[in-house]
Curated annotation (Swiss-Prot):
The keyword Kinase does not apply. Its main location: mitochondrion. GO terms for cellular component: mitochondrial inner membrane; respiratory chain complex III. Binds 2 heme b groups non-covalently. It comes from the Eukaryota. It is a multi-pass membrane protein. The keyword Repressor does not apply. This is Cytochrome b. Its cofactor is heme b. It comes from Perognathus parvus. It is found in: Mitochondrion inner membrane. Gene3D superfamilies: Cytochrome Bc1 Complex, Chain C (1.20.810.10). Component of the ubiquinol-cytochrome c reductase complex (complex III or cytochrome b-c1 complex) that is part of the mitochondrial respiratory chain. The b-c1 complex mediates electron transfer from ubiquinol to cytochrome c. Contributes to the generation of a proton gradient across the mitochondrial membrane that is then used for ATP synthesis. GO terms for biological process: mitochondrial electron transport, ubiquinol to cytochrome c.
Amino acid sequence: MTIMRKSHPLMKMVNHAFIDLPAPSNISSWWNFGSLLGVCLMIQIMTGLFLSMHYTSDTLTAFSSVTHICRDVNYGWLIRYMHANGASLFFICLYFHIGRGIYYGSYLYKETWNIGIILLFLVMATAFMGYVLPWGQMSFWGATVITNLLSAIPYIGSDLVEWIWGGFSVDKATLNRFFAFHFILPFIIAAMAMVHLLFLHETGSNNPLGIPSDSDKIPFHPYYSFKDLLGVLILFAFFFTIVLFFPDALGDPDNYSPANPLNTPPHIKPEWYFLFAYAILRSIPNKLGGVIALVLSILVLALFPLLHTSNQRSMTFRPISQVMFWILVSDLLILTWIGGQPVEPPFIIIGQAASILYFSIILLLXPIAGLIENKLLKW
């Protein structure tokens, strides 16, 4: 008689994905972030569900309903801070996951990579709409500034903005629809993550050497299931340290003031995980140009498979490409810092230089580095 997990239609799917899955024997801890993202998504859906039971999406009561959650609901403060900091944790894992994909050439699995880019856009949209919901000062003005960017689209721009707002300004209709979208999108993300996994399991995982690993596979369980479990425990230790000791470290103090359309905050800025893109947006004086640069800063990821010039897949044995990669990481950190600074010298010129460097490395320098390495190795 066959084992139930190998014969039952539902169990068979789980078995092929998480138990008997043949995995490369040498994948490092950088491969843990996929499972950690799954855990982050589950944390966000569960905490979000409980928050939605007490939250009201009305401009008059939204802010006070969040206050009520923190003060009067049993462990409401914990659920709220887990949800707020869970978003930051989600993006930390997401950026590490993308960085791993770039470093080890995982983007050559084109379908998996492209679904990943769609997932990134969906997560960014969800996080943006979630930030609007507490209806604090930065919520309101962030929503106003970012949605207003769509007015730069020629011909349909202004109509599009009013259509998204549901009126002539960010108001009750906007808050209501943002709540609806913020609730549904994580479930769409979960479905897309399944598709992401489906495409990945068509090819199998990449590995640090970037070479085929068919000759040396091990079962996912118990090896990588326990490895992932260790990753989750480390993640939880880090997560709860932030939630319980520094819950407001990553937030903006302005969001503790209720939204006031008559009073603009001195520095309007998004959450830290969007600052790099915000810096690229601000580095171009033209509104439409800034919006295009903002979209391209993420969409440029789709070009990685086309710009791969090296005869080796991974950067493990490519020192010039490694230097380019770490300069790119440093550049993103500089952009993140600039995004949080006011628009004044010397920050303007630093932001512009960092933005140019960002696109130059991806579109020009890294492909050239790959060609040079091919020549050096006489590959």
